[in-house]
């Protein structure tokens, strides 16, 4: 069906606004909807065509970078590389917690990069992989839900132990549910859940325990090691305090790694803490403003 962005009128208006407000398109977000039918998964050719559609739309909108999800099969990416080069749009695989660079999961994609020699595929780190702590807004939400302080301590101590030992990294598997559960079990989920049950934990306690596995810690050195394959970044954050500190994401250390590596791409603020504050409200614009100031301060340090 016809899309508005196909029209010259739409593009003239869009690029006119970009020029007027001094904006630069940074990265097009794509979602490979390979399960749009109830009775089947799209075949490889259909998925490649869907990726090509998004590459074309990204180009029409002035983007030279495209983000795709970790669930995108490697064959789909490889099958789209020639078209990506033709359209001058780089495909970036989002490295989202619990995934990480310098891991067996990433090695398969690195092999594809080296085998094909492509310059049109790389990684887009999400800064949620650099969490030293579980976000405080998540902890506070658990309290509002009725979690006990004893169980909160169990979960926080378990996360601190994972960080101290070093997270066991997730493996490459097209079955993301299986890979994620294996990752959780390898990182002490059973022991943590057993401790919560022994403490007579309730649903809120179990929610907080499960939520803790949506955050992870990677050494910022991973950025330096892989900088040749990083061209955009989701600067995830959860809660910016009045003093411009983020208690979960290690902003200063991560920005220092980007600086040392000579990174030239964008850091796009991605505010995710608001989803845990829907019952009490939050000024999201102020949160993003503080985050941008924190990034600026770290860059200028």
Question: Language model features by range: what are they?
Answer:
Residues 2-9, 31-49, 83, 138, ...:
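Surface-exposed, active-site-proximal loop segments in enzymatic domains
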Residues 6-13, 44-52, 74-81, 105-110, ...:
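Charged helix-capping and loop-helix junction motifs
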Residues 4, 102-106, 132-264, 278-286:
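Gly/Pro-rich active-site loop or hairpin
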Residues 18, 58, 91, 126, ...:
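Conserved, mostly hydrophobic/aromatic
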